[in-house]
Amino acid sequence: MSKIRVHELAKELNIESKELITILKEEFNIEVKNHMSTIEDEDAELIKELLAGKSPSDLVASADNAENSKSIVDVYEDELAEQLNKGIKKKKKTKKEEQEEARIAAEAEAEGKVIEIGGSITVKELAEKLQQPSNDVIRTLIFAGVMAAINAEIDFETAEKVCAEYGVLVERKEEIQELEVLKIEEDDEENLQKRPPIVTVMGHVDHGKTSLLDCIRKAKVTDTEAGGITQHIGAYTIKLNGEEITFLDTPGHEAFTAMRARGAQITDVVILVVAADDGIMPQTKEAINHCKAAGVPIVVAINKIDKPGANVDRVKQELAEQGLLAEDWGGDTICEEVSAKQNLNIDKLLEMVLLTAEMLELKANKDRRAVGTVIEAKLDKGRGAVASLLVQNGTLRVGDSILVGSTYGRIRAMFDDTGKKIKSAGPSIPVEVLGLSEVPEAGDRFNQVKDEKTARNMAESRKDKLKAETLLANHRVSLEDLYNQIKEGKVKELAIIVKADVQGSVEAIKQSLEKLSTDDVKVRVIHGGVGAITETDITLATASNAIVIGFNVRPDNNAAAQADRDGVDIKSYRIIYDAIDDVKSAMIGMLEPDYKEVILGTAEVRETYKISNVGTIAGCYVLKGKLQRNAETRVIRDGIVIFESALSSLKRFKDDAKEVNAGYECGLTIEKFNDIKEGDIVECFMMEAIKRKEL
């Protein structure tokens, strides 16, 4: 038997759906939830016959009379019934419905309408696979009893039900055995060949790291860097006496500890730059600790020996205090006195690096699949995802398929550190490659695989695992944060999204900002990425109440428009210190304010009603000021405060009221309090916040 929706019948009767719902309930005892509910055609015809001859105004009046006849007690009882009805479970599927689902699945398979998903999928991704609008998929989920937003995760079984509604069959994606695919046999000693050392230059800010690299590379970089410090990690290869050395250029300021530490992990030798006129400084000690932790040998370059205040012996004494005893003092730490500005003893320094590397016996097998690390990555408008890779073993060639973290690609083009196109790169050689599907993370490992299909499947598998781990981690963090807030008092949190032009800057800024956290305000970077600020970033910021910081990047037009609509704050910077100052200002705004109490109004209880499952309703007369729903309330009896809580409901006749002013009557209930009596005074108040002006 066919059915008709309430809104369609209301249209035929020329009345509002709301009025028809009331008439159905009061006059025909037909319960419907909303305008999308359906009723049998037979009932609809009967209703039309019975209401024939009545004008729309009569029908509306009839509905109003039915509604207005309710007492305040009826209103509360109706609301309770509605809440109970919401808890009624949906009936199980009939055999006929199950057979229909099986038929749809068979048809889908015959027509080739099959999609493949993993253990879970977001609503947005499912809509894209189904080639359906997201709103339609959300509506289908709601009808299936699942409330899910566009970015919400749904399990395989729920996705399967949704797809059945669209006549599409779902298959579970096979798990890829990653260890089997990436398994590489141990290299035979006879296949190993000498490889160039990978060197990182470290030291305190302004001690001459970039100047030393300039001198080595014969290229000026210092003058063009924003803020006077190196901002991005690069890699360069130089030749000395027929032998190659690869340099990683890591930032020298202590704010970029994360990038410098990552550089040490793939480094064979570290050149520690110490200014002869300045000695050991905090960042110098930090660099020494990183090298010791990574087990990387150090060659010390005592720089600026041409300056009048240079004191080499004092530097060596301070190095000895840090556990680095110079060779000429009886130790095993190589110290070379240099001047980057005067190009003095630079070749000697490089010879010491090669000597240290020779003692390490650095070897690799170039005749195998390439493996290595991402040094830097960025999104280029014209070229797409661009990654700087350091090959650590094997040989990487144009046309190879590679798996990089949770992204993949087939190398379309490869460039050396001078920008020259090359076809292959062996161990310890840095290259810039094009052809990746997305921008990888700096520090990700890359592996060459047999074909692009394998790389794509493994990347998608890693993404699924990462997504599941992130959801679980977020849940754990939420519980931990709740515990910590209870333990430490009310801790405020400033959520930040960081976007930058290169991945190294993202990590550096993240570390700098999180260092600003205090006992009162925690700074948390909830997301960091490379490239322009997008709509996805703004959506995340809206959901997380976060601000967006862009470092050398800008929002695209759509993102800027969405940020204006949603009131999301976007800040753009070129110098990291400006970002730190602005975040400090934002933190002051997050501090717990001081409070003072403001009395809103008082009312006298003149009558009480008791309703089972609801509690005691107080009929009141407002004496002065106003009563405000959800405001703090205290009950006063004979001049003594007997209870404090919030107003759980406030009504004026049958209608919910936000507030009721002096001289009017109202009905109210108080949260967790039923012992209210006639003659009691209800006092409504609020705590007004007074902002603090400093951390």
UniProtKB/Swiss-Prot annotation:
G1: annotated span: 203-210
Main location as per UniProt: cytoplasm
Chain spans, region G5: 339-341
PROSITE patterns: G_TR_2 (PS51722), IF2 (PS01176)
Chain residue ranges for the region called G3: 249-252
Protein known as: Translation initiation factor IF-2
UniProt keyword list: Cytoplasm, GTP-binding, Initiation factor, Nucleotide-binding, Protein biosynthesis
Organism (species): Clostridium beijerinckii (strain ATCC 51743 / NCIMB 8052)
